[in-house]
């Protein structure tokens, strides 16, 4: 009997010990999970706190969220935020804190373009994106004088500095062959359309002035031309528009029987005989160029020019093209087509996206250095951070992104 009681006591002792072990293990596990959950919340909050320190100027003026700082500065901020919360917690040993914006720096223009499009979509739904007012109305008192960027340090630090330029004239000439694709430029909601709305809202152009202080007057022209002066960018866009209009106008001349007959009569009068054919070609080119030159003047003065013309929207007769118009703009009888900003949209729509985004970032940097912070650099800005933390020998890793 005593032997049985002894065996039962031993068995109960074993069971009790096992239960105590399980209980202690559960208590330890709950404690570790509590620490893990608490650490997760603290580090997440610290990361969000870093993102909350976005550049207020860029957000207010351009709708973009950027954080500034190198890895050392960001890691220091993260450590400060974590230790502020954990400093009095004896059960938390913070062993490593690291934050890096390396994967999110705006050297990658795709990241910037992604955020621009996200902002444009939101702003469009809220009806916040509108074209800048025309320089002839709200803009006269705000319009800047023509400027040239001459600061060597500012020039070499531009985001587009290392991107090879592309020929804007060739781009414009190629658009003349895209008659069936022009409607795509103005299709609401497309990526190209959203980029155009963003650009026309936030940046000046020759005919319109955006809100806020800006270094260049011809900013949209800068996005297209990439030159360092207002005058040169205006000239590059002027050449591009004429290059677009010339083949379209030449095609109309040859498609219009009345104009073909006028060419024939004039060429026979100037060079009768075999040379008349060559003269006719030269006259047609002269006429098309004169009309193209007048088209650009019309656009600058606020008139509209159709992509493909008819007799009613044609402005210059053959005599006027040959004699020259002494700088006078000829307004056609029929007003229809696209205005200057819509022609800018055509060029922007077919422009290389990487180059376009880089030049948008150029302008943000130029304007920030001009009126906000003379040391501002896009190359020091990012749209997110990677976080690596070790607490109590456990690793925690996060990605935080706007």
Region roles according to the model:
Residues 2-76:
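Alpha-helical assembly-interface signal, strongest on the long, hydrophobic N-terminal helix that forms
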């Amino acid at each position: 009997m005593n032997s049985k009681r002894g065996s039962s006591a031993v068995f109960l002792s074993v069971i009790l010990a096992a239960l105590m072990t399980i209980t202690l293990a559960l208590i330890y596990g709950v404690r570790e999970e509590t620490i893990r959950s608490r650490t997760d919340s603290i580090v997440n909050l610290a990361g969000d706190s870093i993102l909350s320190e976005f550049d207020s100027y860029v957000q207010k003026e351009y709708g973009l969220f950027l954080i500034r700082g190198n890895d050392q500065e960001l890691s220091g901020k993260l450590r400060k935020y974590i230790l502020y919360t954990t400093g009095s917690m004896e059960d938390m040993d913070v062993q490593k804190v690291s934050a890096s914006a390396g994967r999110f720096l705006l050297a990658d223009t795709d990241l910037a373009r992604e955020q621009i499009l996200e902002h444009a979509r939101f702003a469009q739904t809220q009806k916040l994106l509108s074209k800048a007012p025309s320089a002839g109305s709200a803009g006269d008192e705000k319009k800047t004088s023509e400027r040239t960027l001459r600061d060597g340090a500012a020039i070499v630090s531009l985001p587009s500095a290392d991107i090879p330029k592309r020929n804007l004239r060739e781009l414009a000439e190629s658009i003349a062959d895209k008659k069936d694709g022009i409607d795509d430029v103005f299709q609401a909601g497309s990526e190209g359309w959203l980029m155009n709305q963003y650009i026309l809202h936030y940046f000046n152009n020759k005919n319109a002035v955006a809100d806020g202080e800006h270094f260049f007057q011809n900013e949209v022209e800068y996005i297209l031309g990439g030159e360092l002066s207002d005058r040169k960018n205006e000239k590059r866009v002027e050449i591009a528009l004429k290059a677009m209009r010339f083949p379209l106008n030449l095609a109309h001349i040859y498609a219009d029987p009345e104009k073909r007959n006028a060419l024939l009569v004039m060429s026979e009068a100037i060079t009768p005989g075999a040379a008349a054919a060559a003269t006719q070609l030269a006259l047609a080119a002269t006429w098309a160029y004169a009309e193209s030159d007048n088209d650009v003047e019309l656009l600058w003065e606020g008139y509209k020019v159709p992509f493909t013309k008819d007799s009613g929207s044609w402005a210059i007769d053959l005599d006027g093209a040959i004699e020259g118009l002494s700088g006078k703009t000829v307004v056609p009888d029929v007003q229809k087509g696209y205005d200057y900003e819509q022609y800018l949209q055509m060029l922007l729509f077919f422009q290389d996206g990487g180059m376009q985004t880089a030049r948008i970032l150029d302008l943000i940097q130029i304007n920030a250095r001009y009126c906000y912070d003379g040391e501002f650099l896009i190359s020091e800005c990012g749209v997110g951070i990677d976080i690596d933390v070790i607490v109590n020998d456990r690793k925690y890793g996060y990605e935080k992104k706007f």
